[in-house]
Structure formats: structure tokens, C-alpha cells
Amino acid sequence: MTIIRKSHPLFKIINHAFIDLPTPPNISGLWNFGSLLGMCLVLQIFTGLFLAMHYTSDTLTAFSSVTHICRDVNYGWLIRYMHANGASLFFICLYIHIGRGIYYGSYLYKETWNIGILLLFLTMATAFVGYVLPWGQMSFWGATVITNLLSAIPYVGQDLVEWIWGGFSVDKATLTRFFAFHFILPFIIAALAMVHLLFLHETGSNNPLGIMSDYDKIPFHPYYTIKDLLGVILLLLLFLTLALFFPDKLGDPDNYMPANPLNTPPHIKPEWYFLFAYAILRSIPNKLGGVIALALSILILAFLPYLHTSNQRSMMFRPLSQVLYWTLVTDLLLLTWIGGQPVEPPFIIIGQLASILYFSIILILMPTAGLIENKMLKW
């Protein structure tokens, strides 16, 4: 008799995706972040659901409803801080996941990679609209500044901004629709994550060597389920330490002040996970140019499969590419720091140089390094 997990129409799908899935035997801990992202998404959906039960999306009561959650709801403070810090955790995992994909050449699975980029955009959109909901000072001004960037689009820009706002400024209509978007988007992300997995399982997982491993596979369960479980435990340890001991470490103190359209905060800046893109935006003195650079800073990921010039897939045995890769990582950390600084010397020039370096490494230096390494292998 066939085991039920192999014959049942529903269990069969789960079996092929998580139990009997043929997996390369040499994938490292960096491959854990896919499952950790899944865990983060589930965590965010559940904590978000409980927060939505007590939250009111009205400009007059939004701020006080968040206060009410923290003070009066049973474990409301914990749910709120888990949700807020869960977003940071989500982006940490997301950036490491993308970084691993770049290092080991996973972007050559084009369908999986492109859906991943779409998932990144949707996650960023979800985080942005979610940050507006507490209706603090930084929520209000962040929403005003970022949505206003769309007015740089020729002809339709201003109409587009007013259409998103639902009026002539960020107000009740904006908050209500942002709450609606923030509620629905995670479910769209979950559906797309399934498609992401579907395409990944068509080709099979990549591995650190970047070579085909079809002749040498092991089942996902029990080997990688145990490995993923270890990752989950370690991540939860880090997460709960952050949420319970340092709940406001990654937040902005300005957001503890109710939104006031008549009083601008001294430094308007987004959450830490958007600072690198914000620094690129600010490094160009032209509004439209800045918006284009901002969009390209993420969209550039879609060009990676076409900029791959090396004969080897992975960077594991490519020393020049490795140096450039870690320079890129350092550059992104530098941009993140600059994004949180005021617009004044020497931060302006550092931001501009870091932005130029970011695009130069990806568009020019990495493809050139690939060609040089090909030549070196022939000598």
C-alpha cells in the first residue's frame, strides 16, 4: 500500500515540496533564509491580524488605538513590538537571502529570481504603508515625502499623488487605504512565495559550488528540516531578545509624537531597511533623477542574469568577484549610515560617491571581473 503522503492529492504536493524534495547535499546555512522568510511572513500575518482587531484606521483615533493596544490589551505591547521588530527581522533575512543569491549565482534561475524581485517590491510596499498606520510624526511626514516623489513623473505625477492620497494632502482617506493595502498585501506575498517555490522546484536548488548536482541528491526531510529548525530557533532567540529587551532600538522616537501637519520633524527619514535607497535618492540633486535612481537601485537586480559574464556560476572560486562583492556589501552599509544622516557636508559627497560606486560595481566592475577571471583560467 502506498504511503498516504505519496498518494493523497493534497499531501502529495506538500510531500514533493517539503519532504521527498531532492536537495543538493552541500548547501550551507545561507540556504536557511528562505525558510526563515516563510517563518517571518507567518509571524507577521498572525501578529498583524491580532493588531488589526484593535486598531482603528481613522486620523483622530489611530494614534490612541495603538496606545490602547500597548496599555489595555492583554499582551498587546508584546504583539505590537513583535510586529514592529518582525519587519526588521524580515528585511535582515531578505537582504541576506538576496546577497546569497548574488554570491552563488542563483539569479541565473531567471523565473525564480524575477518573482523574488517582485516579492521584494511588494514587501517594501507593505512595510512602507504599515509604517504610516501608527500615525505618529514620522509616519505622517514619511508618507508625505515618499508619496510626493511620484509628482516628479512628467505630466501625470501630480494627479497620481492626489489619487494615492485621496485628496490634496495625506489625510483620513490616505490612512484608510494604506490600512487596506497593508492588510491585503501580505496574503499576495504569501501566494507569490508559493509561485517562487514552484519555479525553484522546477530547476532544483543551486549549491555553493554552482555546479549541477542531479547525480547526488538527498531528501529534504529529515536532513534539511532539522537544519531549518536550528535556524528558526537561533532566529527566534535573536528576535525575542530584540523585541523584549530593545523594542524601540530600531524605531524612531519621533513616532511617539502624534502626527502634526503644522510641525515638521528635524530629520525626516524612513526605517533603517530603506536608508540605503533613501541615500541614493538624496545623492542626486534633481527630483526626477533621484526617483529614477531610487527605482533603479532595486530594479538593477533584474539585470544581473544578463550581466553575468563568468564561465563559473558561483563566486566561490573567483577572487576578483569576491573582493567586488564584499566591497558592494560595505558600500550598502555605508549608504545605510548616510541615509540616516542630515543633508550637510561631508555626508553629501560621501553619499554621492557611495551611490556611484554601487551602480559601478554592479553594471561595470563585476562583469569586467568575470571576463578577466575567464582569461586567467585559460593561462
From Swiss-Prot:
Residues annotated to bind heme b b566: 97, 196
Cysteine disulfide partners in this protein: none
GO cellular component labels: mitochondrial inner membrane; respiratory chain complex III
One of the record's GO molecular function terms: metal ion binding
Function text: Component of the ubiquinol-cytochrome c reductase complex (complex III or cytochrome b-c1 complex) that is part of the mitochondrial respiratory chain. The b-c1 complex mediates electron transfer from ubiquinol to cytochrome c. Contributes to the generation of a proton gradient across the mitochondrial membrane that is then used for ATP synthesis.
Name assigned to this protein: Cytochrome b
PANTHER family (alphabetical): CYTOCHROME B (PTHR19271:SF16)
Major localization listed first in the record, in broad terms: mitochondrion
InterPro entries cross-referenced by the UniProt entry: Cyt_b/b6_C, Cyt_b/b6_C_sf, Cyt_b/b6_N, Cytb/b6-like_sf, Cytochrome_b, Cytochrome_b_C_euk/bac, Cytochrome_b_N_euk/bac, Di-haem_cyt_TM
Organism: Thomomys mazama
Residue sites binding a ubiquinone per the record: 201
Database matches in CDD domains: cytochrome_b_C, Cytochrome_b_N
Annotated cofactor note: Binds 2 heme b groups non-covalently.
Keyword Transport: yes
GO biological process: mitochondrial electron transport, ubiquinol to cytochrome c
Keyword Membrane on entry: yes
